[in-house]
Amino acid sequence: MTNYPITYRLIKKEKHTGARLGEIITPHGTFPTPMFMPVGTQATVKTQSPEELKEIGSGIILSNTYHLWLRPGDELIARAGGLHKFMNWDQAILTDSGGFQVYSLADSRNITEEGVTFKNHLNGSKMFLSPEKAISIQNNLGSDIMMSFDECPQFYQPYDYVKKSIERTSRWAERGLKAHRRPHDQGLFGIVQGAGFEDLRRQSAADLVSMDFPGYSIGGLAVGESHAEMNAVLDFTTPLLPENKPRYLMGVGAPDSLIDGVIRGVDMFDCVLPTRIARNGTCMTSEGRLVVKNAKFAEDFTPLDHHCDCYTCQHYTRAYLRHLLKADETFGMRLTSYHNLYFLVNLMKQVRQAILDDNLLEFRQDFLERYGYNSSSRNF
């Protein structure tokens, strides 16, 4: 049996759904699953300190290979002792491969079998990223969980294009495995692609499972498809992945999508959504989204969320938060970001309890009604 640096321990399956309660053991600690992972693109979760993230209960955070490669450089981070020491974070770190950022640069990239040529968004210079280079960067960063280099095709791309794309992604995954210098202390995940095509998702999953990665990611979702389309892809994709390994749905952070992903057997999620919207004054609460910058909150001396135990809600009012954000004070962004991250990490804590109690579907229904989602449009 292979000894992986990343292992998944199943604790309990929910009786009525595909949801599973577990934990993932990494070289930098163990975290419970299902788990939402805050995103620290530039080796920092915007406006939050490592101590605050630990208070929130984030046992793992995500950093971005593409951005750290460009600035300050992966070799500099390696000389600093790796990403954990560089950013003073002693818990788990996951790095993406740079594939999604390259996907985002659709107008300035060229994909070949060797890799991707694209323009550096900082200075316009020509850059080249290959499967081997993506692995080398992540080896230098020293993350606990790494991603294979993949192409993320648009969800509505033609079948023939997506077929060629997933076959190339499988070849890239194999090249990445061979290039991986630190398999003893960094777990490399394969990324299943295939847009909305069931047979292509099946082919992609079969290719990657045969390579025996320590864990698997589901990519190519949350890129413009509907909620129902995402759920349909998860319905036929998640069962293709090994039960004894972690399953990670990339780039998903809306509360309803988190719950519906868990129902389909997903263990890990990440998204910039909670911090990005927080900086503009949009806050997630138990009764739906609240835009605290709105004028109606100017003299509202109540907490953001009456049912929230986070530091922000225990100590500050909507009126004060509105004032800070209207005055462009960084402290306001810190407080709203803290709250939104706490909200999603705590939501996953509640989901884990619902799995333990075998009442996840009831929890889902109650949450959607309170949050303001139209349940009929959120069928699963």
UniProtKB/Swiss-Prot annotation:
<comment type="subunit">
    <text>Homodimer. Within each dimer, one monomer is responsible for RNA recognition and catalysis, while the other monomer binds to the replacement base PreQ1.</text>
</comment>
<feature type="active site" description="Nucleophile">
    <location>
        <position position="270"/>
    </location>
</feature>
<keyword id="KW-0819">tRNA processing</keyword>
<feature type="binding site">
    <location>
        <begin position="96"/>
        <end position="100"/>
    </location>
    <ligand>
        <name>substrate</name>
    </ligand>
</feature>
<keyword id="KW-0479">Metal-binding</keyword>
<comment type="similarity">
    <text>Belongs to the queuine tRNA-ribosyltransferase family.</text>
</comment>
<dbReference type="InterPro" id="IPR036511">
    <property type="entry name" value="TGT-like_sf"/>
</dbReference>
<feature type="binding site">
    <location>
        <position position="150"/>
    </location>
    <ligand>
        <name>substrate</name>
    </ligand>
</feature>
<dbReference type="GO" id="GO:0008479">
    <property type="term" value="F:tRNA-guanosine(34) queuine transglycosylase activity"/>
</dbReference>
<keyword id="KW-0328">Glycosyltransferase</keyword>
<dbReference type="GO" id="GO:0005829">
    <property type="term" value="C:cytosol"/>
</dbReference>
<keyword id="KW-0808">Transferase</keyword>
<feature type="binding site">
    <location>
        <position position="220"/>
    </location>
    <ligand>
        <name>substrate</name>
    </ligand>
</feature>
<feature type="binding site">
    <location>
        <position position="308"/>
    </location>
    <ligand>
        <name>Zn(2+)</name>
    </ligand>
</feature>
<feature type="region of interest" description="RNA binding; important for wobble base 34 recognition">
    <location>
        <begin position="275"/>
        <end position="279"/>
    </location>
</feature>
<keyword id="KW-0671">Queuosine biosynthesis</keyword>
<comment type="pathway">
    <text>tRNA modification; tRNA-queuosine biosynthesis.</text>
</comment>
<feature type="binding site">
    <location>
        <position position="313"/>
    </location>
    <ligand>
        <name>Zn(2+)</name>
    </ligand>
</feature>
<feature type="binding site">
    <location>
        <position position="339"/>
    </location>
    <ligand>
        <name>Zn(2+)</name>
    </ligand>
</feature>
<dbReference type="GO" id="GO:0008616">
    <property type="term" value="P:queuosine biosynthetic process"/>
</dbReference>
<dbReference type="GO" id="GO:0046872">
    <property type="term" value="F:metal ion binding"/>
</dbReference>
<keyword id="KW-0862">Zinc</keyword>
<feature type="binding site">
    <location>
        <position position="193"/>
    </location>
    <ligand>
        <name>substrate</name>
    </ligand>
</feature>
<dbReference type="InterPro" id="IPR050076">
    <property type="entry name" value="ArchSynthase1/Queuine_TRR"/>
</dbReference>
<feature type="region of interest" description="RNA binding">
    <location>
        <begin position="251"/>
        <end position="257"/>
    </location>
</feature>
<feature type="active site" description="Proton acceptor">
    <location>
        <position position="96"/>
    </location>
</feature>
<dbReference type="InterPro" id="IPR002616">
    <property type="entry name" value="tRNA_ribo_trans-like"/>
</dbReference>
<comment type="function">
    <text>Catalyzes the base-exchange of a guanine (G) residue with the queuine precursor 7-aminomethyl-7-deazaguanine (PreQ1) at position 34 (anticodon wobble position) in tRNAs with GU(N) anticodons (tRNA-Asp, -Asn, -His and -Tyr). Catalysis occurs through a double-displacement mechanism. The nucleophile active site attacks the C1' of nucleotide 34 to detach the guanine base from the RNA, forming a covalent enzyme-RNA intermediate. The proton acceptor active site deprotonates the incoming PreQ1, allowing a nucleophilic attack on the C1' of the ribose to form the product.</text>
</comment>
<dbReference type="GO" id="GO:0101030">
    <property type="term" value="P:tRNA-guanine transglycosylation"/>
</dbReference>
<protein>
    <recommendedName>
        <fullName>Queuine tRNA-ribosyltransferase</fullName>
        <ecNumber>2.4.2.29</ecNumber>
    </recommendedName>
</protein>
<dbReference type="Pfam" id="PF01702">
    <property type="entry name" value="TGT"/>
</dbReference>
<dbReference type="GO" id="GO:0002099">
    <property type="term" value="P:tRNA wobble guanine modification"/>
</dbReference>
<dbReference type="InterPro" id="IPR004803">
    <property type="entry name" value="TGT"/>
</dbReference>
<feature type="binding site">
    <location>
        <position position="310"/>
    </location>
    <ligand>
        <name>Zn(2+)</name>
    </ligand>
</feature>
